[in-house]
Amino acid sequence: MTAATQMIAKALDHARSSAAPDLAAVKTRQQAAWSSGDYAVIGATLQIVGEELCEALDLRAGQKVLDVAAGNGNASLAAARRWCEVVSTDYVPALLERGRARAAAEGLALDFQQADAEALPFADATFDAVVSTFGVMFAPDQDRAAAELLRVCRAGGQIGLANWSPEGCIGQVFKTLGKYLPPAVGLKSPALWGTRARLSELFGSAALSIKTQPRYFNFRYRSPEHFLEVFTRYYGPMLKAFAALEQSKRAGLKADLLALVGQLNSSADATMVVPSEYLQVVITKR
């Protein structure tokens, strides 16, 4: 290798390393964001998604089910209502406490554990089903998170996911936030989990089948302004985004978000009904 070639190779290596995001730092920021606000206020409205996912998986009593990045426990509770043996995990302790309180109110027996989706503290092939609703899709290291879901699921078991799609309301909210606070260079969008192509990359070689179905969740609020008020108060990533911006940019972000939900609003009165597309996924492990 000539000196010139060595210099070029070194420059390319440096460019690649410079472009690679610091995933540990991203995760730390994410954990702080999800720990702020009170996601459970919003998460509880999404309960129907967990119920529908458990039906799509055709869960049976006695099956061992792991909920990854469970938030306040929507899918966890849905599985427990079907008499499954459920372990509910998240890396935000406060959200686990909300899930624990909900389970206690219903008299449901679940195991709640703090855990990182990219390093699950369970042995290989422990669970009959592994689920995540709008959770694992936010893991910074997507390949590692997918590998962990596969690792803890038994052969012939199922992985059930609900992931916001890029073109749905929440996917477009992500894009709007990204205009004001660009993500780390090289970081893959969480909304890619809502595409068949990315799921095939993440799970294809280890899957007997990947079944996907586009579905919609309707966000129902008093008005677009009410929607934004709730999300900026309780949805950690949005709360943090507004806090990080100077006043003029906050006004611009607010205007853009109101315009977005106003455009998508299907309500014929003064209220807000915005359908947000997500991808329901059922993967059978090889």
Model segments located where?
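A short glycine-rich, Lys/Arg-flanked "PGG" loop and its adjoining helix->strand segment in the class I
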Residues: D143-Q158
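Class I SAM-dependent methyltransferase SAM/SAH-binding core
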Residues: K64-A119, A129, R144
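A short SAM/SAH-binding and catalytic strip from SAM-dependent methyltransferases
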Residues: D128-Q142
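Conserved Class I S-adenosyl-L-methionine
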Residues: A191-R286
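Conserved class I S-adenosyl-L-methionine
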Residues: D13-Q63, N74, R98, Q158-P182, L228, ...
